[in-house]
Amino acid sequence: MAVFKVFFQHNKDEVIVRENTNTIYVEGETEEQVRRYLKDRNYNIEFITKLEGAHLEYEKEHSDHFNVENAQ
């Protein structure tokens, strides 16, 4: 399992504006699994990145909302 950081807008109809970008963390096997997990939400997904090593540790320590959802 890996942790993915998902950058998104709350509404698929919104134009992507960096200042309105939200993030969530999702644990899954692949990016495709994470996308399937989120498909029923009305999110306009900008980008998904896999977090590993020092990057993952940094997010755990410095994110105010590091709560991981499970895509299983």
Curated annotation (Swiss-Prot):
Q: Which family does it belong to?
A: Belongs to the RNA polymerase subunit epsilon family.
Q: What is its EC number?
A: 2.7.7.6
Pfam families xrefs = RpoY
Q: Which residues form a coiled coil?
A: none
What role does this protein play? A non-essential component of RNA polymerase (RNAP).
Give the matching Gene3D superfamilies.
RNAP, epsilon subunit-like
What name has this protein been given in UniProt? Answer: DNA-directed RNA polymerase subunit epsilon
Going by the UniProt record, its keywords in alphabetical order are:
DNA-directed RNA polymerase, Nucleotidyltransferase, Transcription, Transferase
Coding gene? rpoY
